[in-house]
Swiss-Prot record:
Organism of provenance: Influenza A virus (strain A/Bangkok/1/1979 H3N2)
Protein's UniProt name: Matrix protein 1
Family the entry assigns: Belongs to the influenza viruses Matrix protein M1 family.
GO molecular function: RNA binding; structural constituent of virion
GO cellular component: host cell nucleus; membrane; virion membrane
Organism placement in taxonomy: Viruses, Riboviria, Orthornavirae, Negarnaviricota, Polyploviricotina
Amino acid sequence: MSLLTEVETYVLSIVPSGPLKAEIAQRLEDVFAGKNTDLEALMEWLKTRPILSPLTKGILGFVFTLTVPSERGLQRRRFVQNALNGNGDPNNMDRAVKLYRKLKREITFHGAKEIALSYSAGALASCMGLIYNRMGAVTTEVAFGLVCATCEQIADSQHRSLRQMVATTNPLIRHENRMVLASTTAKAMEQMAGSSEQAAEAMEVASQARQMVQAMRAIGTHPSSSAGLKDDLLENLQTYQKRMGVQMQRFK
């Protein structure tokens, strides 16, 4: 796996699923391929994206700044600086300075990542802030190692939270989660079907599913009534794909 592929993998692991994630993935691919060289426009686009947490925007802004060539006098962006200040906690800043001193002596991506993984996400973000604000300089490889370690820390906590939700025995949470997944699947079906003339049937199924979820929420239904909703939708989607000559069995 190449260095940039690894960086893209880690960064995308902390972005919530949805159309925006696909858009960000495309921007990262373009940046890493040298196709997008307007850092100012890229940062303005990132700043106005909805849904993303300030820290995720800060990390993406840091990656774009590391990768896209820019004029030396280009101003640092406030939204990135604020996200990478470790919540203003002096303990985070102290640890970030110690980490920076270690990273300065490191030259490899994996070496930097190993060192950084023993620090908290707050200290890692603060260390990125030091580098972003030009208060410290490390090689691009080392900076990418720091980025990936930070993303791994964040993804670990997100995974723990997701696992807790999936494993919950609370029927109301499970019911709502199934309806959210069904609604998201229906939206994806509508997007996939939208570019085809034979899509009327798939669009109809997706539309009915979304109306059903809305009705279930409006009137309040038994928690078991949502069981199998998403799987039924996916079966419809795969039937439609087979008719279109597309063989994708990876959704479940």
